[in-house]
């Protein structure tokens, strides 16, 4: 029942034509079918907090028998403009040229005479519809931006905790302004949009909550980092995997221990289901592993920067070395050749955690240079996250690309706080991050990043540090979303170019009237050829990253030969190595098989699928257990 356990924005799209931009007239809508549902509701407060959830819940009992009339009944319209779902109420806003109308679901339909007016309206709506979430997230999210060891930003937000940042933390996060400026004119344009968006938030706060401190750039940077930590990262579990391997070798011997380890991690697997055609080799396992470290079994001890923090609010390493990240996003796309309508179809089910109020909310945006509708969130200054433009739609699933590596630091000078790097004994830094519920938060750092724990190698103590490729660059993700929102995306190739801008790791999907496409993003490091990507890297300086995967090297593709592009957080392409924390992602039995199985079952005699067929496949697959369908029969 994964689909029900988390927030789901379901997008149903089929396109008939190409859009020609016109000044700021009512937006031309080229969709044949465009419907969505956001179960957590628009405002997260009564009476509209459960309206959509009740609608969507009624879909589940239908299993594989969803009809066109069911789609109309249980999903609301995602058409552009105010043509459906009335009656509408008009808000009073202190901004000339901006109109906000709410439909019966509370969804705001924005009409603005200027681009900046649309961005301002998005800020006003964020403060109005997610005020509690904004206040709870703005400071707690900072632990994600600084990679505070053992702390989960989303856990602190959901647990209503109180992190108060130090000036050191504020200064560190503020450096993301430099990252935007270094990105050239596009980065500077994002920065301008952030400032306009902040004006909208703060105008609402001034009018309705004057005691609340104004929102700042750092707040936007921090909530972007929260999104990155929660959904846009992968890897960083090498210490636990390494000590697990150490245990296997101790128990089974080197040859058998390595064999079991490699069988379990399934770094690559030519029998695993994939989403696109072609091969994209990344992060191979070398035969020479001289740059890797295997620590002693059960020797890894994570640092605890906040010993008084409850376990459920932290991100401390589990005692289970095989525990995966919990992800549940799926996407089903059908090419025009396989579609009964002759146009591509998409059903997207991105899962972003079920909270009240939800992390995302909906906007229908109509301003010069901004014509979109769909899910957005506090990190996005007037930009689309998941949804549609006039003639395309987009959704995503977490890719969990390997953007985090752990390093084994050789200690020196008889100290736990001195380490060897490029032949010199260095002293670790100290990062005083602030306080959590009044208790100080402080951690050590090396040239690679925060010290996350200690372990032993053949009885000798080492420090374990963590390096994230997107550190200090979380906000660059917004360049992708800006392009989705401002008309820059005009086809698969421009979509690939846009998606390549984000350092966060996602599978991003695209559909228009002719094509379906996918691009897997992330600032993916190229490792030294002597480093096993699933193990700790020696931190002495000889085995550092050699650069990052090129845009062309990222998995991407369009219109697969099978006629179906399906993903449920599985590997997208052959040869693409799974991150060290993603054991089983490349397994031959995957839950995505439930979706393809139902799609194949629902095909008509001529091999075609309509929208009801695709929704039925999604609904049925989400209510089945992959083990019962594929594995248990083999044991009978």
Where are these regions (language model features)?
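Hydrophobic alpha-helical segments
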Residues: 382, 504-602
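Glycine- and hydrophobic-rich flexible loops that cap the catalytic core of alpha/beta enzyme folds
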Residues: 367-381, 387-392, 396-539
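Substrate-recognition/specificity elements adjacent to catalytic centers across diverse enzyme folds
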Residues: 26-345, 350-353, 368-370
């Amino acid at each position: 029942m994964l689909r029900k356990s988390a927030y789901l924005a379901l997008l149903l799209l089929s396109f008939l034509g190409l859009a020609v931009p016109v000044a700021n007239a009512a937006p031309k809508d080229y969709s044949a079918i465009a419907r969505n549902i956001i179960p957590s509701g628009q405002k997260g407060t009564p009476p509209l907090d459960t309206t959509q959830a009740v609608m969507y819940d009624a879909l589940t009992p239908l299993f594989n028998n969803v009809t066109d009339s069911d789609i109309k009944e249980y999903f609301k319209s995602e058409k552009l403009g105010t043509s459906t779902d009335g009656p509408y109420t008009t808000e009073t806003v202190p901004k000339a040229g901006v109109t906000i109308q709410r439909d019966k679901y509370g969804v705001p339909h924005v009409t603005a005479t200027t681009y900046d007016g649309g961005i301002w309206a998005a800020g006003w709506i964020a403060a109005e519809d997610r005020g509690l979430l904004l206040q709870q997230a703005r400071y707690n999210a900072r632990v994600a931006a600084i990679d505070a060891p053992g702390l989960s930003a989303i856990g602190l937000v959901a647990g209503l905790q109180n992190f108060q940042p130090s000036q050191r933390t504020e200064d560190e996060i503020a450096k993301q302004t430099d990252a935007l400026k270094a990105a050239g004119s596009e980065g500077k344009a994002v920065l301008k949009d952030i400032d306009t968006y902040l004006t909208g938030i703060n105008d609402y706060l001034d009018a309705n909550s004057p005691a609340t401190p104004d929102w700042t750039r750092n707040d936007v940077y921090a909530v972007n980092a929260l999104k990155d930590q929660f959904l846009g990262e992968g890897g960083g579990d090498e210490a636990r995997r390494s000590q697990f391997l150490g245990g296997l070798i101790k128990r089974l011997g080197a040859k058998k221990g390595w064999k079991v380890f490699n069988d379990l991690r399934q770094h690559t697997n030519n029998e695993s289901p994939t989403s696109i055609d072609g091969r994209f080799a990344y992060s191979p396992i070398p035969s020479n592993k001289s740059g890797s470290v295997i620590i002693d079994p059960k020797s890894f001890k994570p640092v605890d920067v906040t010993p008084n923090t409850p376990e459920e609010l932290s991100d401390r390493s589990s005692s289970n070395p095989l525990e995966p990240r919990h992800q549940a996003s799926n996407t089903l796309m059908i090419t025009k050749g396989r579609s009964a309508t002759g146009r591509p179809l998409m059903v997207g089910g991105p899962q972003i955690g079920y909270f009240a109020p939800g992390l995302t909310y909906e906007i229908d945006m109509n301003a010069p240079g901004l014509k979109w509708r769909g899910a957005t969130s506090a990190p996005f200054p007037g930009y689309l996250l998941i949804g549609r433009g006039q003639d395309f739609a987009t959704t995503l699933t977490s890719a969990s690309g390997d953007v985090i590596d752990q390093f084994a630091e050789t200690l020196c000078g008889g100290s736990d706080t001195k380490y060897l790097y490029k032949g010199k004994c260095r002293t670790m830094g100290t990062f005083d991050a602030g306080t959590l519920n009044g208790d100080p938060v402080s951690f050590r750092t090396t040239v690679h990043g925060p010290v996350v724990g200690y372990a032993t190698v053949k009885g000798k103590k080492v420090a374990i540090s963590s390096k994230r490729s997107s550190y200090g660059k979380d906000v660059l993700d917004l360049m992708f979303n800006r392009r989705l929102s401002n008309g820059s995306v005009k086809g698969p190739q421009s979509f690939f170019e846009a998606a390549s801008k984000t350092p966060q790791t996602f599978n991003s999907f695209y559909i228009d009237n002719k094509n379906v496409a996918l691009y897997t993003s992330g600032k993916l490091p190229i490792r030294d050829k002597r480093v096993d990507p699933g193990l700790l890297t020696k931190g002495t300086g000889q085995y550092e990253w050699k650069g990052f995967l090129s845009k062309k090297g990222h998995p991407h593709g369009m219109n697969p030969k099978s006629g179906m592009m399906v993903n449920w957080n599985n590997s997208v392409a052959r040869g693409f190595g799974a991150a060290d924390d993603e054991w089983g992602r490349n397994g031959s039995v995957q839950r995505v098989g439930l979706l393809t199985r139902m799609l194949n079952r629902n095909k008509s005699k001529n091999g075609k699928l309509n929208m009801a067929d695709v929704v039925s496949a999604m609904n049925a697959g989400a209510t089945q257990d992959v083990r019962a369908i594929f594995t248990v029969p083999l044991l009978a």
